[in-house]
Structures are given as structure tokens and as C-alpha cells.
Amino acid sequence: NEEDNVGNEVVNAAAIAENNNNGAREVEEGDHDVEDNMGRIVMERIRWPVQDLQKGCKWTTDLMANFAIYFGHILSTSFYPVLQRAIGVGSAFEGWSPRERDVVYRVLVPMTPPRGHTFHLELDTAGQRCVRNFRVRVQLECTCTGEHQGADMLCFLHHPEEELRSNQDPSLLHTLCTASYLDVQKTARWFYQLVRAIWPALPQSHTWHLVLLPSRHSCQFKVTNGRESFRIEVLFGVRQGDSDVFVSSQPREACTPSTTWPETYAVAEVKFFKYIARRVPPDSLHLKCLQFFTRLQLGSGFSTYTIKTVVMHLLTIIPVSRWRRRDFVRRLMDISENLRLCVEVRRLNHFILGNRRLPREISLPPEVQMSRTCNLFHHLVMDPVAHSQAMSEY
């Protein structure tokens, strides 16, 4: 579709033009020295996050691994969702942060149905552009035969209700669901109770203090030891098949119904940044470019996700060898110019939806990979005032 390709063509044209214009200069060593020195001067004047992101990510990963061990023990015979090992998502696990302080370490905990239950994802056709909303319908399944037979479990479908009430815990339908659908807020409250109960048994509790923070759609907490602290947010999700796309508890709007689970591409995006990290030179500054430009735009009309999308597109176009210190200023100019061009033509393609050029290790459901590309700037098409305001940012 011609319209769908406009955004990528804008990015392609700008990047190629920039590289062609500078190709001759890059061959000369003298220019390399000047550009490298300029990049060094700019970087020295930038304030990077105080916290060591790699250290914070490792600490968070270790903590969630310990939680997972206890989740397995406590929930193995229950009828609550089965909690899988947490997956680090978001900017910190991608290797950057838009803020100097108050870094949030975000993880996604995949959930699978407990025995005697199945999950079915139902697409909400009333979803907005670029955001597919789902509901997770919970159904009971017969356990009279098969792997659960004789496993000290009564069949929810075929045993009398009186016998079930007297001899077995209630099904998931009666604990975390609203009208047969998994409820985000009930799930969050349940997870808070788990964290509060398990924390004293963890080795981290001996030297760290846990403070639970309020949230209706996730579990947020801060851990401190007097010298340093980490803020962690735990999201819950259900995987779509065997792909890297989930439906998650993170809402896109303030008034999202509690049975709505928006589609999230956070795991796929983390895998993309890991793919890039394996291919760039050791001194690559692609993350610092993203970090600096995002911080530059804080408080403007452009979201962090918009800037990240522009950079992800550029990372697939500009060779990985051209993100070194000597290229730092030029890459910042690329990001700025590409953002301006996308605003001007009122089109910025979503990086995951409909992108058929992603690395093979990123697994997408067929309907996501083959879908029509989604314009993140659709609101600028519909609202001339918003478009004029966005242009004025430059």
C-alpha cells in the first residue's frame, strides 16, 4: 500500500541522503579526528543516568528469579494463574533511560492457565488505531480423563457443586475473574498479596527494605538498603501462541475497563535492541543517542515512544558501524531531521505492526506481521491544529 510506505520512505530518504553527503568526508582521517573530538565534547556535557542500568537490571532479574521459585511452590496445587519467569522489558532492559534519576525497572510476568482451566484471547473490535485490545476469557475444562485424572483434583465440570465447595478451592472464575474474563485489577491485588507474603522468605529481605507502591494495573514497589534503591514494576501478561507478543495489564488509557488487556510489543522490542547490541561495535553510541534525544524532548509534545520508534527505524537503515563517537552529532541530526520529516508528512509507521523486515528471532503472530502498517501520527492527519503545534516544536 503506497500510503503505508510513506513513513518508511521518509526515513530511508533522509538517512541515505545524509550518508551519501558525508560519504566522501568519512574516508579522510582528519575529518574522523574532528568529528570524534566533537562527539567527545558533546558527550562530556551530557548528564547520563546516575544509576548503573546493567546492575539494576541484574538485581531485578535475580530478585524476580527468587520470587519465581516461591511462586512455583505456593501455586503448584492452586487454581490461580501459573506464573512464569519474568521478562525484563522497557527502556532500562533495552539499555537506556529517558531520565537521569527515578529509573523504573519493568518486568512482564507471563501467566498460563492453572489445571482445569483454559485461556482464550478475544479481540475487542472497538479497539483504537495501533492498539488492539483483548479480553482473556477463562473456561473450565474436564479433568475426569487425561493428565489430571487421579491427581487429587475434582472436575469442576462434572462433580456436584456441594462436593466441590466442601473439598476443593474455588476455580479461577470465582477468584480473579469478572463475568468469565480475567480481571486486571483483581490480578494485581492478588499479586500484591503474594509479594507481601513471600518477601520475608527471600534472601534480599535480610539487607533490603520493601515498600509497596499503589497501582491498580500492576505491582509496583521500591527496595532500599540505605545506600541505593531500585523501583520495580511488575506487569502481567498472556502470550499470544509461541510469539513475542503478549496481552498485558498495562493500560493505554486512564479509563480502561478492568477486563481489557491491551496488546504489547515490549518483549519484541527488547529482543530487537539485543539483536542490535550483538552487531554494533563495542564503542557504539546508539543507545546514548536515543537517551540524549529523548531527554531533550521531555516536556514537549513528542512521547518517549515516538522518539524510540524513529531511532528503531534508523537502526535498521544506517549501518551499525556508523553509530560510533565520531558519528554522535551526525546521528543526533538524523534523529531530529527524521522526526521533523515524519511530522511534516504526518506519518510515522509503527515499528512492529506490519513490519516484515524484523530479525528472524523476533516471533510475531501472523496477523501482527501481515497487518497493515499503523500510523502513529494519525492524530495529526485528523487534527490540523495538532499538526501545526507539532510543527512548531521545530
Regions found by a protein language model. Name each.
Residues Q84-G90, H206-H217, T309, H350-L358:
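Acidic carboxylate-rich catalytic motifs and surrounding loops in phosphoryl-/glycosyl-chemistry enzymes
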